[in-house]
Amino acid sequence: MLNETNYAIELKGITKSFGKVIANENVNLSIKYGEILALLGENGSGKTTLMNILSGIYYADEGTVSIDGELVSITNPNEAIHLGIGMIHQHFKLVEVFSAADNILLGTTGKYSGRGVERKKILEMSNKFGLEIEYDKKIYNMSVGEKQTVEIMKVLYRGAKILILDEPTSVLTPQETEKLFLILRKMKEQGNAIIIITHKLNEVLAISDRVAILRKGHVIDIVSTPETNEKQLTELMVGRPISLEINRPETKNRKTVLKVVDLSVVNEDGTMGLHNINFKLKSGEILGVAGVAGSGQRELCETIAGLMNAKTGAVLYNKENIIGKTPDEIINLGISMSFVPEDRLGMGLVGSMDMVDN
């Protein structure tokens, strides 16, 4: 039974510096069980640093942390999880060649009842929170949304009752985002305390009960979500009035740049990833592709970019078929095409290299 009389978390006077850079200064923040708190702020406002202190990755220079009304000292992530705090990072901490079940069980301590019994516990937890996942599926075959579900299961399996999610929707489709929100609402109903780090105003208003706004390392204000709006949150976040209107310029004399004709793709496991896809993309146009996880968005993008082979069909760039060509060959043809993958860090960047080299 979760303690409903004390705050789940209470931070007082938290200050953290990195050299001369002050990331957080005299931050006071609290959250109760059965509540979703959004931590809102621009990039560099101190949101992630504050939560890294709470999850044991950093240690505060000044201030106190209380869990369930008791002062605690969190010096590493292991201590945090023992106190019931679980953090789902923006870049997932999963072993790609392991299955979902193996990742969930990896590193668990205490009495081990056998793989069959432990899997039964995982399935019971899945049903409790509405978390749907194929537990024998390898991580490298999963969409970003599925990987995130595994991360959530990892912390729940370890007994977390306080969940921190760092930019959880940054690489999710709208459908995956709505599915995540359904899961979070169910967790809230079960009495969990949830903190979401974000800068997406519409999502803040859709999911949270309260909003804490950070700017330059300070908590500027904490507001009740039903009593605020996008305009107020924007002004609190950036410190000045700002227009939310977008003026879209009209493009004339548009011509077809990319044409996909009867495109079919078979996945690594032999299933059909795409079946007879047809569309045109014109210059000066933004084409949106929507669908739930596993509907073929990844296969479509990777096939156009030359990262997957098509079974049948054509991809015409200015009437030239680029199917079967590698990304290098496409570039050598003088075709200016960029591909930003859904897993930006794992597939799109070299983490050990700096920005210029990447």
Regions found by a protein language model. Name each.
Residues 2-358:
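Glycine-rich phosphate-binding loops of nucleotide-dependent enzymes
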